[in-house]
Amino acid sequence: MSIPADLKYTESHEWVRTEADGTLTVGITDHAQEALGDIVFFEVQQLGQTVSAGDTVAVIESVKAASDIYAPVSGEIIEANPNVADTPDAVNSAPYDNWLFKIKPADGASQDRLMDAAAYGKSIGE
């Protein structure tokens, strides 16, 4: 199972990449897509909204289950990935290339609850 070292992770199996402009790109981990199975639907429900860390911002559905996707930090949801909305199963084949949404962190938004790759690996028994 792949856990890229350059990303941060949440307990709810989202990965987070900090971009040069300070925005955060968010997707689901390899572990999450494997647990979900074949992904058939994805929708960001909070586009353009200001959310708090831990708020549900999107839903992803597979043939087995539906799963909420959470904001890793407080901020504004500024973009959803249209490619994943059109072809959600792309997340199964490349979960770290097919991001779900981007969030602009609120001033002073804490990223303390994010884990590094080693801590995330331990949390899932890798």
UniProtKB/Swiss-Prot annotation:
Q: Does the keyword tRNA processing apply?
A: no
Q: Which UniProt keywords apply?
A: Lipoyl
- Which residues are reported to carry the modification N6-lipoyllysine? 64
Any one GO BP annotation for this protein:
glycine decarboxylation via glycine cleavage system
Q: Which family does it belong to?
A: Belongs to the GcvH family.
Q: What does this protein do?
A: The glycine cleavage system catalyzes the degradation of glycine. The H protein shuttles the methylamine group of glycine from the P protein to the T protein.
The protein in question is named: Glycine cleavage system H protein
Q: Which gene encodes it?
A: gcvH
